[in-house]
């Protein structure tokens, strides 16, 4: 039986990319019986008599899975945040980073609209970028109006399945339109009343860019820490994870425990205060989370 990758899921149909092209498929009833939902990014076995009528027969094991957006087997996440309009938001970026780290996906931070910043804002954004680079993250600067700066991103996409995510209105669809102009993905201006953009992507689809596949993922409604526990959170902050091995107490939450290496690193300036503040805020959110039954 032929194998392929689901590159689009829409209205109960799964579009499977394989050596000979793309075949439109439906899922077998056994998936519903076993409560399995094929996802974009799934590697599958399928059967088809023609390109428009096929059936997905088997879904291979996934290395990771996101719920919102519903996508599997992601190699990396391109987290797009604008320098201005809306202003760069490290708190929201850290929220995305925690979720991506928790799912063992490599994050790449892409700061867009650098062509719109004044000198003061540029210094602020570059200072944040240097902080995140010191934590081990790749940070790229792009300007939506110049294709040359978008080319900076292309080498990072080669041979990978990438998710594009980020704050609404930061230029995710505009970025993909520059990478692949024929896509003509719809973009919306920022709402002056809310200071944020309306989401313009309606479904998840993997798009070929070079030798890579990129998903323009809709929404950011999944930013609640539904599955993450307090003990997981340290491991989603690389610099806290590094320092925590020197804490006196195993299972230290880095809040009130004595001889905490993380708090010491914050006091010494080795961990930024805003990252530690966000960590504490996330701990509080998780502890106040209502239990699920």
Swiss-Prot record:
Zn(2+) binds at residues 247, 252, 254, 260. One of its GO terms (cellular component) is cytoplasm. PROSITE patterns: ENGC_GTPASE, G_CP. One of its GO terms (biological process) is ribosomal small subunit biogenesis. Keywords: Cytoplasm, GTP-binding, Hydrolase, Metal-binding, Nucleotide-binding, Ribosome biogenesis, RNA-binding, rRNA-binding, Zinc. GTP binds at residues 112-115, 166-174. Its cofactor is Zn(2+). Belongs to the TRAFAC class YlqF/YawG GTPase family. RsgA subfamily. Gene3D superfamilies: Nucleic acid-binding proteins (2.40.50.140), P-loop containing nucleotide triphosphate hydrolases (3.40.50.300), Probable gtpase engc, domain 3 (1.10.40.50). It comes from the Bacteria. This is Small ribosomal subunit biogenesis GTPase RsgA. One of its GO terms (molecular function) is GTP binding. Residues 63-223 form the CP-type G domain. The keyword RNA-binding applies. One of several proteins that assist in the late maturation steps of the functional core of the 30S ribosomal subunit. Helps release RbfA from mature subunits. May play a role in the assembly of ribosomal proteins into the subunit. Circularly permuted GTPase that catalyzes slow GTP hydrolysis, GTPase activity is stimulated by the 30S ribosomal subunit. It is found in: Cytoplasm. Monomer. Associates with 30S ribosomal subunit, binds 16S rRNA. PANTHER family: SMALL RIBOSOMAL SUBUNIT BIOGENESIS GTPASE RSGA, SMALL RIBOSOMAL SUBUNIT BIOGENESIS GTPASE RSGA 1, MITOCHONDRIAL-RELATED. It comes from Bacillus anthracis. The keyword Iron does not apply. Its EC number is 3.6.1.-. Pfam families: RsgA_GTPase, RsgA_N. It is an enzyme of class 3 (hydrolase). Binds 1 zinc ion per subunit.
